[in-house]
Amino acid sequence: MSHPASLASRLHALALNDTLFPDLHQLEKAQRTRTIYRIFHTVASTAALGQEDIVDDLAPLFTLMESPCLTRQGGLCPLLASHYNLYLGTLLELGDRHHPEIIGQIEEALALRTHGLYLVTELGCGNNAMSMATEVRYDCATDGFILHTPHRHAAKFMPYIALEGQPKSSVVMARLWVGEQDCGIHPFLVPCRDARGALCQGVSVSSPDVLDLPYRGGSRHHHLRAGNTPPLGMAQGS
């Protein structure tokens, strides 16, 4: 567990390091993106948050999110919030801590070997979760789940997934279907970039045509077999 006062002191010292925070306006788009991720990794490594800092004593997480490092580089805020609060927070609060895949993804994210994403917003409905069109169908033959984006308006927009070479995993909000029964919106654990940073099979990414969003874009899932990990918060067999 990180002591908040000690953590605040370390992060304050880090924020004074001008070498860590270059002027991004002097860099090309790809360089800006990779620089932000380098800063993210340095700041997150300095914080070294554990499970208890995210779901039990939240003071270290709040200390991180209130750090002056975020005023030096505003792009840190969504990356840190997505990784710790949304992705890891969901896995730790709702995930089955005895399931080997969930255990593995938590360990990878805490060690910063993968970056966590949270895919909710859709191109056609924004954050209106009840209108969400991304679907997961239960496959009784394999006791697994198949994730699919049925049309372009259901593309998740705009997750931090477009940058190549970055291992990433995600919590995807999708509508669960069991046969013809609509079982509502549930979160699913879905890796989207492998250890080499390549897109996983069944995942595609499109870059926005107009907006200058260097590492964001629309993501789709094409009949992606999401394994037999049950919806987060739902016990296997329930």
Residue positions per predicted region:
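Long, acidic (Asp/Glu-rich), low-complexity accessory segments flanking structured domains
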Residues: 226-238
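Short beta-strand segments that buttress and anchor functional surface loops
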Residues: 118-122, 173-176
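Sensory/regulatory domains in signal-transduction proteins
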Residues: 120-128, 153-156
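Amphipathic, small/basic residue-rich leader segments at the start of a protein or domain
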Residues: 1-115, 126-127, 138, 144-146
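Short Pro/Gly-enriched beta-strand edge/turn motifs at strand-loop
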Residues: 113-121, 205
